[in-house]
Amino acid sequence: MKIKELWNKIRKGVKAGMAAVTESNVLTDNRVVSMIEKFKASGKYKLMQEGERYYQVDNDIKNRKITRKVDGHKEEETWRANNKLAHAKYKIQVDEKIAYLLTKPVTYKTDGADKNDTYVEKVKDVLGKHFQYQLTQLGYEASNKGIGWLHVYLDPKGKLKTIMIPAEQCIPYWSDRSHTELDAMIRVYNTTVWQYNQEKEITNVEIWTKDGVKYYRLEGQMLVYDNDKSMDAGGPVAHYKSVEEWETWGKVPFIPFKNNQIEMPDIKFVKSLIDGYDLGRSEAANYMDEVKNLIFVLKGYGGQNLSDFIKQLNEDRAILIDDTEDGGVDTLTPQMDITALREHYEQLNRDIVESGQSVNKDLDKFGSAPSGVALKFMYSSLDLKCKLMETEFSRGFEMLLYFVDLYLQISGQGDYEKIDVGLVFNKDMAINETEQIQNCSNSQGIVSDETLIAHHPFVSDVEEELKALKEQKAAEGPAWDTAPPVKDDGNGCLLYTSDAADDL
C-alpha cells in the first residue's frame, strides 16, 4: 500500500471519529427527555428539595408516625403522644453564613488600567443598584441547593438584565469534567394555563446553546416543538434582538454561582445530625406526655389484650375492674436519666456546629466579651466555609463580566475587555470595636488609607466613605492648606490683606 493511500485512510478514520464525537454531543429529543428523567430521579435533585425544606424548618420529623406490629402488620398508634419538634438549626447556619459574607456591600477592585474608575462605574451602572441583593439571593440558592444560576438577557428597552433561575429547573450540559463551561442548558418548569375554563399544568422545556434557544412542551415521553416561541418572522430566535435581527452572546447565557467546588448544598453535611436532634427532643417530650412512662401492676383486670388497656387508659383516662374487692391498679414510676439525656443533646449540638462549620458560641470557653483573637477563633470554621463560596462567586462574577463587556461594546459605550475587575467581599464579623479602632490607629502610615477604612468598625460602605473623605478634604482645602495673601506696608513689614483678615 502506498503512503498516500494509507494517509487518506487515516484521514477518513479521523474524520469519522470526529463526526462520531460530534454526533454523541448532539442533544436529540430522546436524550433531552432522558436527561430530564435522570435529573429528577438523582440524589442531587433530592438534596435541592431537602435543602429548601430544611431552610423552611419543614424537617423530616414532621412526617413521623408511631407504629407497632399487630398480627404481623404495622398499625399506627394515633392515640399515643407524638411530638414533632423541628429545630431551625440549619436555617440559622445558612442565615449566619449569608449575613457574614454577603450582606455588606461588595467592593469592586480593578487594576491600574481603569483610569478614574470609568469601567467600574459602567459595570455598576449596568448591573444596577439591586445587584447586591441578587448576590444575596444567589448565596441562599447555592447554600440550599449547591448551585445558583444567573440568566443574562436584554429587556424590551435593550438594557442588560439578570435574573436568578431556580436550580431545580436547570439541567446543565457541561463541556468539561471540571464544570467550568457550558455546552447547553436545559431548563424545565411548569406553568398553569386555562383551557375551556379548566386549569391545566404544562411542562415547558427550553434548550439554550451558544447559537440560540429552542422552546418545547413535554407531553409524556415526547418533546413537542413550540413553533410560536422558537420562530420569529420566519426565522429562528436567538439570545437577544438587536434592531430587527436576532443575535447571540457567543456563550450560553447562564452563569453558575457554586456553593463549593463539588456543588453540594450545606444540608448534605448536617441533615442526619439534625434529624437525630429532632428525634431525641421529640422522644423526650413524648416521655413527659405519655402515660406509658408509668409501669402498671393490674389486679382483677378483665381484659385480655394489654394494648387495649393502654389505649383505653389514654383515651378514657379510666379502666374497668372485674374484682371490686381485691382488684386494682398500682403504678411504678421509672426514672429518666436527665443527665445522660442532656449530655446527648449537647454533644449532638456540638456535632451540628462542627459539621456545619458554624460559629462556635460556647461562652464558657471565650467569655461574654471575647478579644479579637478569640473572635477570630470562634469564626474560623465559618470563615473557611465562606472562603470556598467566595472563590466560586468570584469565578461566577468573572463569567458575568464577559456579557457586561459585550453589552458595553454593542451599545457603543466602549471596549473594556482588557481591564480586569474583581469583587472584594467585605465580611461582617462581630468584633471588639475598641481593639479594632486601636489597631487601625496604630497602622496609620504602614498601610493605605483605603485598607484602614475597610477595617474600621464604623464604616459600612468603603467606597462611599472614601468618596465622602475626598469631598471633605476638597471643601476644607482652602481653609487649612492655603497661605493667606499678604502685602508690604512700605516699612518692611508684611500685613494680611483685608480679605485674609476676614477669613481669620
Q: Language-model segments: what does each one mean?
A:
Residues 1-173, 180, 485:
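Extended, helix-rich architectural segments
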Residues 112-117, 121, 300-303, 318-435:
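Surface-exposed loop-to-helix/strand elements on domain peripheries
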Residues 149-254:
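Extended, regular secondary-structure scaffolds
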Residues 401-417, 448-465:
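Long amphipathic alpha-helical coiled-coil segments
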Residues 456-484:
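Long, highly charged low-complexity segments enriched in Glu/Asp and Lys/Arg with interspersed Ser/Thr
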Residues 496-504:
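Conserved small/polar residues in nucleotide/adenosyl-binding loops
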